[in-house]
């Protein structure tokens, strides 16, 4: 049972990383939002912490930037998708 949860968390992290990479590579997204997405990516890739801690750190960054009124709707939707994925990751 433990192995399936670990694998499930890894799949969720990969999906979140993929969505964040699409935000980082989108030049239509303002620089401060791309910077926050990069910071969230760095948290997700930091192997020193458990998946739950990495996800919580990334959610903190993304939640703050999701309130930005200059964020394009497509990027906001992706940020919300990432937050929804990351909130399901537990240790």
Swiss-Prot record:
It comes from the Archaea. SUPFAM superfamilies: Ta0600-like (SSF158436). Belongs to the UPF0147 family. HAMAP family: UPF0147 (MF_00342). This is UPF0147 protein DKAM_0139. It comes from Desulfurococcus amylolyticus (strain DSM 18924 / JCM 16383 / VKM B-2413 / 1221n).
């Amino acid at each position: 049972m433990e192995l399936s949860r670990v694998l499930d968390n890894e799949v969720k992290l990969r999906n979140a990383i993929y969505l964040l990479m699409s935000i980082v590579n989108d030049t239509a997204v303002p620089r401060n939002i791309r910077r926050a997405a990069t910071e969230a990516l760095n948290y997700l890739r930091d192997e020193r912490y458990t998946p739950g801690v990495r996800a919580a750190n990334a959610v903190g960054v993304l939640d703050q930037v999701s309130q930005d009124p200059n964020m394009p709707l497509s990027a906001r939707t992706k940020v919300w998708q990432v937050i929804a994925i990351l909130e399901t990751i537990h240790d």
